[in-house]
A protein has these predicted regions:
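Intrinsically disordered, low-complexity basic segments at termini and long loops, enriched
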Residues: 1-56
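Alpha-helical solenoid scaffolds in large eukaryotic transport, assembly, and signaling factors
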Residues: 57-391, 395-399, 404-406, 414-427, ...
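Eukaryotic acidic, Ser/Thr-rich intrinsically disordered low-complexity regions
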Residues: 57-58, 64-66, 437-438, 472-547
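Intrinsically disordered, low-complexity regions enriched in proline, serine, glycine
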Residues: 193, 215-216, 284, 405-406, ...
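Short, contiguous acidic/charged loop-to-helix segments that flank catalytic cores in large enzymes
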Residues: 399-400, 421-424, 437-442, 462-468, ...
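Generic hydrophobic alpha-helical scaffold/packing signal
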Residues: 394, 409, 413-416, 432-439, ...
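Alpha-helical bundle/repeat cores within regulatory domains of eukaryotic proteins
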Residues: 439, 443-476, 489-497
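Intrinsically disordered cytosolic tails
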Residues: 101-141, 145, 444, 451, ...
């Protein structure tokens, strides 16, 4: 009997009982005590007989309900027991298959969450097919296409390389991957439209995964250049998969108009995420593949540039660290080199918004060569952009990080060699005020690198052509260096630069030298006057204290 039936019966009993005179109809009824009280029905008030009968009705109903539930549970338990016995009997007849399935499941389930795949791989039940599928070279020609597809399907099985389990299956998969790469190298028209989805599925199942992250102590000092990269443990499989996918991308059999349905924007976003891998071998393959895709799939070019720009935005404004910035900049250097003239506003915005702000990143040392090359490519395409690049670098100048200052000076010299006189004239004052500060920098590498600017003939020519404005800025810093700098090499370079300036315009040099001496004397007098005033204030304070 259900709870609803019990409630209905209770309501019916209540209605019937209210119409009876319990004192006459049930004269010998004795109630059980309620709430710890004792006595007969009269002890509990006028409603005690009704409550007693209701309790008896509820007790009987509850007992029936309990018996019904027990009976039904017993029947269900018997059914489950018989079913489990039947299942055990059937599994016992195929114990070998279940054991293989457990082993295959273990093979495809990573022990560490960092090695889990971002794309769903094929079920592990196909791992036993590595040994059962015949060799491609042994199959009849008419069956090789289906066999090729079957081998790609079984190669979508992913193994966990964080342990030594399934060594035979791992080696069998590696041999199968090598076999399909060999088949692609020796077979014409092997990438037809029907197989493209299988290719993308197999490649994605293997390479798209959650990248390993290194847990670093935030308080521990470490130099990124000294850190050993964390190599991918699954590289014996990944390398062959990347090699296979590279063959697919560069194959003449692959029509980009058809393949773009499979190598789509979602695929490209996942591919770009892999550039953050710590393994330089993987990033090198990714760089080659992405460059080939950009060259072949023209419909994806604009999207790829925007996606790379988004990666740079995350590096600049969020993480400040990314392992693949250098490789992405290397690809961009080739892309910028192919820009048509005049440059589109889209390409200029990419420079201003995404490339130049990369100078702010703390890890600049890991990719500054590629970034400097991109800057040079833009200036070669449009010399007017030199003003934007140099003034932005001066705005982002790393005042307190001397190692980054040296990198900035290297890039400044390379950019100045490509700068035209009109752009140089616009920024010469702010530029050489910064260089004057660098000349007098106590860090000898910064001072030395700045003085090396006079070894570049084109920069010397630009300086001499604007010497009326620049000599007064530079000569004072050079004289200060010659008297105060501690490094002997910097002293030698300083005297060489002074000699070059004197030979370029002796009259102007003497005039600037005289002005510098007058400024020093005036500064000395101001310093003496300042010291005298402080002395007077000190004496006034002492007199007030004594009083």
């Amino acid at each position: 009997m259900t709870d609803r039936g019990a409630r209905n019966k209770a309501r019916w009993l209540r209605r019937q009982l209210r119409s009876l005179d319990f004192r006459t109809a049930v004269p010998q009824l004795t109630l059980w005590p309620l709430s710890g009280q004792t006595g007969q029905s009269g002890d509990l008030g006028p409603d005690a007989p009704e409550l007693g009968v209701l309790l008896m009705g509820f007790t009987a109903t509850t007992m029936k309900l309990i018996q019904t539930v027990k009976r039904r549970m017993g029947n269900d338990g018997d059914k489950k027991t018989s079913t489990s016995r039947t299942g055990a009997t059937s599994s016992g007849g195929s114990s070998g298959g279940s054991g293989d399935l457990a082993a295959k499941t273990k093979a495809t389930t990573p022990a560490n969450s960092t090695s889990s795949r971002a794309m769903t791989a094929k079920p592990a039940t196909e791992s036993s097919s590595f040994a059962t599928i015949p060799k491609l070279r042994e199959a009849p020609p008419q069956e090789r296409t289906d066999l090729f597809r079957k081998k790609m399907e079984v190669c979508a099985v992913v193994f966990d390389f964080h342990n030594d389990n399934n060594q035979k299956e791992k080696e069998a998969k590696r041999q199968t991957l090598l076999e399909i790469v060999e088949y692609v190298n020796n077979t014409r028209n092997c990438f037809n439209e029907a197989l493209m989805q299988d290719v993308v599925n197999m490649v994605g199942a293997n390479i798209f995964r959650a990248l390993q992250t290194r847990n670093k102590d935030p308080l521990a000092f470490s130099d990124p250049e000294d850190d050993e990269p964390s190599l991918e443990r699954a590289w014996p499989h990944l390398q062959i998969v990347y090699e296979f996918f590279l063959r697919f991308v560069v194959s003449n059999d692959v029509d980009p108009k058809i393949a773009k349905r499979f190598v789509d924007q979602n695929f490209m976003l996942k591919l770009l995420e892999l550039f953050d891998s710590e393994d330089p071998r993987e990033r090198d393959y990714l760089k080659t593949i992405l460059h080939r895709i950009y060259g072949k799939f023209m419909a994806l070019r604009s999207f790829i540039r925007r996606a790379i720009q988004h990666v740079f935005f995350k590096v600049i404004y969020e993480s400040e660290t990314h392992n693949g910035v250098g490789e992405l900049l290397e690809i961009l250097g080739s892309i910028i080199n192919g820009f048509a003239l005049p440059l589109k506003e889209e390409h200029k915005d990419f420079l201003i918004k995404a490339l130049i702000p990369l100078h702010k990143v703390k890890s600049l040392a890991s990719f500054y060569q590629q970034l400097s090359y991109c800057m040079a490519q833009y200036v070669e395409k449009d010399p007017r952009l030199a003003y934007d690049i140099i003034t932005s670098m001066l705005r982002y100048w790393p005042v307190s990080i001397t190692s980054k200052q040296v990198l900035f000076l290297n890039e400044l010299e390379e950019t100045l060699e490509l700068t035209q006189p009109p752009e140089f004239h616009r920024m010469q004052d702010v530029l050489f005020r910064r260089l004057a500060l660098c000349i007098t920098c106590p860090h000898f590498q910064v001072a030395e690198r700045t003085l090396f600017f006079w070894n570049t003939d084109y920069i010397v020519k630009l300086i001499n052509s604007n010497r009326q404005e620049l000599f007064p800025i530079i000569i004072g810093a050079l004289y200060k260096n010659s008297k105060q700098h501690w490094n002997s090499a910097v002293h030698g370079l300083t005297f060489n630069v002074l000699k070059l300036l004197m030979e370029a315009d002796p009259g102007l040099f003497d005039e600037c030298s005289a002005k510098h001496r007058a400024d020093e004397e005036e500064e000395g007098r101001r310093e003496q006057e300042r010291a005298r005033k402080w002395q007077v204030l000190q004496e006034m304070h002492d007199a007030k204290v004594k009083a």
